[in-house]
Design a protein with these regions (language model features):
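ABC ATPase NBD coupling module
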Residues: 1-3, 56-73, 97, 102-106
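A short, proline-enriched helix->beta-strand linker immediately N-terminal to the Walker B motif
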Residues: 144-148
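Short coil-to-helix segment of the ABC ATPase nucleotide-binding domain corresponding to the Q-loop/switch region
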Residues: 85-92
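Conserved H-loop
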Residues: 179-185
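Conserved ABC ATPase signature
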Residues: 125-129, 133
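Helix-to-loop junction immediately C-terminal to a conserved catalytic motif
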Residues: 39
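Conserved ABC ATPase "signature" region
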Residues: 1, 52-55, 92, 96, ...
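Catalytic Walker B motif of ABC-type/P-loop ATPase nucleotide-binding domains
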Residues: 150-153
Length: 191
């Protein structure tokens, strides 16, 4: 009737600070659209997304940029790494966009690189890494900006089962250290 395809309807949830919140459902059920609505990578046609009483849907472009640069980060299913940049540059990309000096962002990127278990891989290019290692780089890039909120859109679904399990364990270990608010999207009921 409206000319729109309804991908997400009547969804309401609350995530506490430091909580890991999992959205699980079948492929095609709107999970990825939901997480993209939270970050406004997809523009919702109705409703609200509140972060500390601030409505993301009502934010101006400038406010949205600030939210994405300083309070929120996202880890994608297909890594989203920049192939022409070394691992250390991929990790520091969000800090570069913020205007952080090169030396400072490389120090931060190296710190996070160690945190995700990729010491010594900073000067390599994404094509030189396995899928699991590339996903660790994506995770490190998200952590480097020290966000309050991390959104994960099926980050491990492209990985083989053994690597997937390792990455799940790694994420749980990291969460016990960094205590970020995490929204995790998956279709895999074993995750």
């Amino acid at each position: 009737r409206t000319g729109h395809v309804i991908a997400v309807k009547d969804v309401s949830f609350e995530v506490q600070e430091g909580e890991t919140f999992v959205v699980m459902g079948l492929s095609g059920s709107g999970k990825s659209t939901l997480v993209r609505c939270i970050s406004r990578l997809v523009e919702p046609t109705n409703g609200s997304v509140l972060i500390d009483r601030d409505d993301v849907i009502a934010m101006s472009e400038r406010q949205l940029i600030e939210l994405r640069r300083h309070r929120m980060s996202m880890v994608f299913q297909h890594f989203g790494l920049l192939p022409h940049r070394r691992v250390i540059e991929n990790i520091g990309y969000g800090l570069e966009v913020r205007g952080m000096a090169r030396r400072e962002r490389e120090d931060k990127a190296n710190e996070v690189l160690d945190m995700v278990g990729l010491q010594g891989w900073g000067n390599h290019y994404p094509r030189e890494l396995s899928g699991g290692m590339q996903q660790r780089v994506g995770l490190a890039r998200a952590l480097a900006v020290d966000p309050e909120i991390m959104l994960f859109d099926e980050p491990f679904s492209a990985l083989d089962p053994l690597i997937r399990r390792d990455m799940q364990d790694e994420l749980l270990n990291l969460q016990s250290v960094v205590r970020k608010t995490m929204v995790f999207i998956t279709h895999d009921f074993l995750e």
